[in-house]
């Protein structure tokens, strides 16, 4: 490891030194500097990465930033569109949940008992749910992506970095407005609008809104189902700015949004395979072992009988999964998305003269209902229902220096965060298995169902400070520290359906069933006592695709309650030096953490331990440069990160089965480099490129079982002869060998037979690549404003993004691998005046079909979510 560390940094230092050695023509890059318009110079971008407004090129942190004009011109409509444009940033998605990845850090657990690893902030307010990060951008002023832990100034759950959105603020004394209308493939129609109105010399209001409709780009060939990734969203925001004098300002923002339609399923939306030959693996039908007969879903009910719409004697051989590509499914259930978000934000500031007091207050009321066809087939077998409710309040107070003549810049602050979260998950299975079941799905003859309810409360308090001192001219030293205490309460209860057992089956085949009972009593949540947020009266609330069966009853089968405190100090040390006014060198070491939490599930308390925070120590060196009269910008960074206490899922044996829990069971390291180049040689011409190299590996990750306890034990320690597979001896007599999904776990000690679960033994996968961490990513882009004289300007713009191959899960099997790919976006914009433009665009011109999320489902079926296919459209923009 030490050798890799030294080699990586040696290469990076050489690159950075070469960059600084290029001839530089000094130009003031401080606030207020004007671009060199006669040579097509590069405009400066103001960012708030250090909680104060600064020129991007003066900030000793790896950060990419985009202005409102760049967001519009490059089609950055949401966080997912940043992939490739931001070096080293990859974007995964399951349904409506964002799963971004930066420098080997990814968001995996998005449940009630989990926190994100990449922070998401809107106007300085932390957004606690991963779903909130997938909303479209509306009237934004700036988008920033900070790479590396931001544990000092931003705090908890900025383990891998930050995504910070700044919305457009009201402007005093001006009437402004805009309208954007987008039409496109899949019936897309979107309207964005804003208006800025001055009420008086000291008061202004800005209102922005958006409406979007589309038909969905994942086609369902089943007439009973619906297309996925359609859109039915509405957004409204109103911001009031009051500046009665030069010292005080107050910006109060109200926003409301909804998203409806079918959504994108809850986890993955398509099964792409299984990690073993399902034709040779036993499954259980009503407790009786039977064999799978078809790798694409054959007869799994073990009964030769006539089924409605099926063959007279057998249901073998009818395909389950829709033929074709990743954008075609065959599911019978109409999935649902019903999301609502209400928020109030207040940003207040008062300048005392050399010191500024700032207050940032945020309140969010979030709710999301989602369903999915959990058998992923065209048969009425199983459906999932999720209902998540979150109410969040945060208050931050900052005191920061504002004396530009001083050698010392400092900021101190206090932060309070309170989050109340309730999650309901319901699974229902229809009576009796019918043909073409999902691979390896165990079902009972009379169907079944279960209901899980989780309640989590998080209260976080933090105090922080950071100071930068200019020791001598152009040389600055920065030190910062943050202390955080998280108090978490967690309650879990589970109820299983108890169905009548008479008859074969007891209820008519094809009847949808679910739990039909009152809420789980508050007493089930132990020490939590009486609660007021358990308001459901039926499970689930009436929705299409769900029917209630009056004969059902429910029995409480498990309950857990726990509380814990997690305390952590994070810090940052840095030094930066201006070689010239346009060339900055910096080096830093910083730490970050992701908060700990609780496990949930059935079983004794001993198997439901809390898990501690994940921790990271990050080393970084970098350089930010402007050359050739402000026409070339080159930013470089190299990093080495150590991750400890990784929160990873593990299966443990319990009562003849296995339980899935989260433990701090791993370590990892990531090193690499990033480069961003922008060249504007003449007015109107822009050429750019970025590239990132990443080597992210697990250094300690043992006893990891196959997903959901379904490791394949292919040898029997009780047999007296060697085990031969395809003519090759894989185990001697008396040995057993375990295979996980596409991964040979090797020989495992013990005496069990073939039927014994291997989850108690697991695999050592140290040295495997961290999921969603391609070695190489980057982009090349170019645009040119062609002067048409009285007809305005015509601007072609093209960008090609690329990624090397990567794995989607820790086992690194070939089934989980996304091959390398390139994607091309094209845009052509005609602007007859400064106030009107028309843009035609094609995203993903070559229709590359890439997977951005892999997840192992029950029974070893691999589910996947694909990135959007090729899409074309047109955009009309009007400004006044």
How would you name each of these model-derived features?
Residues 115-117, 129, 138-141, 147, ...:
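Outer-membrane beta-barrel translocator/receptor signature
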Residues 164, 173-174, 180-182, 198-293, ...:
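Periplasmic-side early beta-strands and strand-to-turn transitions of outer-membrane beta-barrels
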Residues 218-229, 264-330, 374-382, 424-453, ...:
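Solvent-exposed loop segments that connect transmembrane elements
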Residues 2-74, 80-85, 246-247, 344, ...:
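N-terminal Sec signal peptide and the immediately downstream disordered periplasmic leader
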Residues 799-811, 815, 829-880:
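C-terminal beta-signal and adjacent terminal beta-strands/loops
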Residues 40-172, 621:
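Acidic, small-polar-rich N-terminal luminal/periplasmic segments of exported/outer-membrane proteins
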Residues 347, 351-352, 358-362, 367-372, ...:
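Membrane-embedded beta-barrel scaffold of Gram-negative outer-membrane proteins
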Residues 30-32, 477, 640-642, 663-810:
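Gram-negative outer-membrane beta-barrel transporters
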């Amino acid at each position: 490891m030490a050798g890799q560390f030294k080699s990586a940094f040696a290469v990076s230092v050489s690159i950075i030194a070469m960059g600084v050695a290029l001839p530089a023509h000094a130009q003031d890059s401080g606030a207020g500097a004007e671009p060199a318009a006669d040579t097509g110079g590069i405009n400066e971008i103001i960012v708030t990465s250090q909680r104060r407004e600064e020129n991007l090129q003066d900030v000793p942190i790896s950060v990419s930033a985009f202005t409102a004009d760049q967001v519009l011109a490059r089609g950055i409509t949401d966080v997912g569109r940043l992939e490739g444009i931001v070096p080293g940033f990859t974007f995964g998605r399951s349904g409506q949940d964002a799963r971004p990845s930066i420098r080997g850090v990814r968001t995996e657990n998005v449940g009630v008992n989990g926190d994100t690893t990449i922070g998401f902030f809107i106007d300085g307010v932390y957004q606690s749910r991963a779903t909130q990060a997938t909303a479209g951008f509306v009237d934004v002023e700036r988008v920033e992506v900070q790479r590396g832990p931001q544990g000092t100034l931003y705090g908890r759950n900025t383990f891998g970095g930050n995504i910070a959105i700044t919305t457009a603020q009201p402007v005093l004394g001006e009437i402004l407005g805009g309208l954007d209308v987008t039409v496109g493939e899949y019936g897309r129609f979107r309207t964005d609008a804003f208006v800025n109105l001055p009420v008086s010399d000291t008061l202004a209001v800005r209102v922005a809104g958006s409406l979007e409709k589309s038909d969905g780009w994942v086609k369902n060939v089943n007439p009973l189902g619906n297309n996925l990734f359609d859109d039915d969203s509405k957004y409204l925001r109103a911001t009031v700015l009051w500046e009665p004098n030069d010292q005080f300002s107050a910006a109060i923002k109200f926003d409301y949004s909804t998203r409806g339609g079918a959504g994108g399923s809850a986890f993955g939306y398509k099964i792409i395979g299984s990690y073993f030959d399902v034709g040779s693996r036993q499954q259980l039908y009503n407790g009786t072992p039977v064999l799978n007969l078809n790798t694409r879903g054959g007869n799994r009910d073990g009964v030769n009988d006539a089924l409605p719409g099926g063959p007279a004697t057998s249901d073998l051989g009818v395909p389950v999964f829709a033929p074709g590509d990743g954008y075609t499914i065959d599911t019978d259930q109409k999935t649902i998305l019903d999301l609502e978000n209400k928020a109030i934000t207040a940003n207040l500031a008062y300048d005392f003269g050399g010191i500024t007091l700032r207050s940032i207050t945020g309140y969010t009321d979030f709710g999301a209902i989602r369903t999915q066809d959990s058998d992923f087939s065209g048969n009425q077998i199983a459906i999932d229902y999720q209902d998540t409710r979150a109410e969040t309040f945060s208050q931050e107070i900052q005191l920061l220096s504002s004396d530009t003549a001083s050698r010392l810049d400092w900021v101190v602050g206090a932060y309070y965060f309170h989050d109340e979260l309730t999650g309901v998950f319901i699974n229902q299975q229809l009576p009796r298995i019918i043909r073409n079941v999902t691979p390896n799905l165990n079902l009972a003859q009379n169907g079944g169902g279960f209901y899980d309810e989780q309640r989590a409360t998080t209260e976080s308090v933090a105090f922080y400070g950071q100071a930068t001192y200019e020791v001598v001219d152009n040389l600055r030293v920065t030190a910062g520290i943050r202390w955080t205490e998280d108090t978490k309460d967690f309650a879990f209860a589970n109820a299983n359906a108890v169905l009548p057992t008479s008859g074969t089956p007891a209820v008519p085949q094809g009847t949808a069933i679910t739990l039909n009972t009152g809420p789980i009593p508050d007493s089930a949540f132990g020490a939590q006592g009486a609660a007021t947020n358990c308001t459901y009266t039926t499970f689930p609330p009436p929705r299409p695709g769900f029917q209630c069966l009056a004969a059902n009853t429910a029995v409480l089968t498990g309950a857990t309650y726990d509380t814990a405190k997690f305390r952590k100090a994070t810090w940052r040390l840095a030094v930066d030096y201006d070689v010239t006014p346009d060339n900055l060198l910096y080096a830093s070491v910083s730490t970050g953490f992701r908060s700990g939490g609780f496990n949930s599930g059935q079983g004794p308390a001993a198997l439901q331990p809390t898990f501690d925070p994940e921790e990271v120590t990050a080393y970084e060196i970098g350089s930010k440069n402007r050359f050739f009269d402000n026409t070339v910008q080159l930013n470089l960074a190299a990093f080495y990160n150590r991750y400890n206490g990784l929160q990873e899922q593990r299966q443990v044996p319990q009562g003849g089965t296995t339980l899935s829990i989260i433990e701090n069971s791993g370590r990892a390291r990531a090193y690499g480099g990033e480069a961003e180049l922008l060249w504007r040689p003449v007015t109107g011409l822009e050429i750019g490129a970025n590239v990132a190299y990443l080597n992210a590996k697990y250094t300690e990750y043992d006893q990891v079982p196959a997903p959901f306890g379904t490791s394949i034990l292919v040898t029997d320690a009780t047999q007296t002869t060697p085990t031969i597979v395809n003519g090759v001896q894989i185990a001697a007599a008396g040995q057993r060998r375990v295979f996980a999904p596409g991964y040979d776990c090797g020989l495992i000690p013990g005496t069990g037979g073939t039927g014994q679960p291997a989850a108690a033994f697991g695999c050592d996968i140290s040295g495997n690549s961290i999921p969603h961490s391609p070695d190489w990513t980057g982009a090349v882009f170019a645009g040119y404003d062609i002067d048409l004289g009285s007809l305005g300007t015509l601007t072609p713009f093209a960008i090609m993004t690329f990624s090397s191959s990567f794995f989607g899960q820790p086992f690194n099997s070939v089934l989980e691998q996304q091959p390398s790919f390139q994607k091309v976006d094209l845009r052509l914009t005609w602007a007859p005046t400064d106030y009107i433009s028309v843009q035609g665009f094609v995203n993903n011109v070559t229709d590359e079909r890439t997977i951005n999320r892999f997840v192992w489902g029950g029974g070893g079926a691999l589910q996947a979510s694909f990135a959007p296919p090729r899409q074309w459209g047109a955009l009309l923009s009007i400004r006044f």
